Amino acid sequence: MRLWVLAIGSKMPAWVEAGVAEYSARMPPQLRVEWRGLPLARRGRSGDPVRWRREEGERILAATPAGAERIALEVNGRNLDSEALAQRIDTWFHSGRDVALWVGGPDGLDPALQPDWRWSLSPLTLAHPVVRVVLAEQLYRAWSIQAGLPYHRGGEE
């Protein structure tokens, strides 16, 4: 089973690459996370975010593995705490099905995309580079909960 993170934007600062690499390296080989940065739509002076989102949505769909569960990361998606995400990871792992996590560009995701469900990392608006690091850490945290590792100490005083 693989988790595919398909994110619009391919040029990330070094601190983002380092954070993503750190948490990805901690994941077990049987639960690999593949990060794929997809090019932004070419933005001109005319300013047509509908067209940009459509082009980026087409890139996301083209990069999504056939048969993968498709999850859109959106501010209005379902909120999950770390334990609920850990349960979700366990379900994905035991299904054997690949999972594609879609991260839109600066103008969001194309509304025409049809994800299997929508997930919100936070009700806050996060810069796209920050989303990648937070997502990497939360995927690792969820896996560590399932594996019984001491990394997560939620609810302890």
From Swiss-Prot:
It catalyses: pseudouridine(1915) in 23S rRNA + S-adenosyl-L-methionine = N(3)-methylpseudouridine(1915) in 23S rRNA + S-adenosyl-L-homocysteine + H(+). It holds the Pfam family SPOUT_MTase. NCBIfam families: PRK00103.1-4. One of its GO terms (molecular function) is rRNA (pseudouridine-N3-)-methyltransferase activity. It is found in: Cytoplasm. S-adenosyl-L-methionine binds at residues 73, 104, 121-126. Its main location: cytoplasm. InterPro entries: Alpha/beta_knot_MTases, RlmH-like, tRNA_m1G_MTases_N. Specifically methylates the pseudouridine at position 1915 (m3Psi1915) in 23S rRNA. Homodimer. SUPFAM superfamilies: alpha/beta knot. This is Ribosomal RNA large subunit methyltransferase H. Its EC number is 2.1.1.177. Keywords: Cytoplasm, Methyltransferase, rRNA processing, S-adenosyl-L-methionine, Transferase. One of its GO terms (cellular component) is cytoplasm. Belongs to the RNA methyltransferase RlmH family. CDD domains: RlmH-like (cd18081).
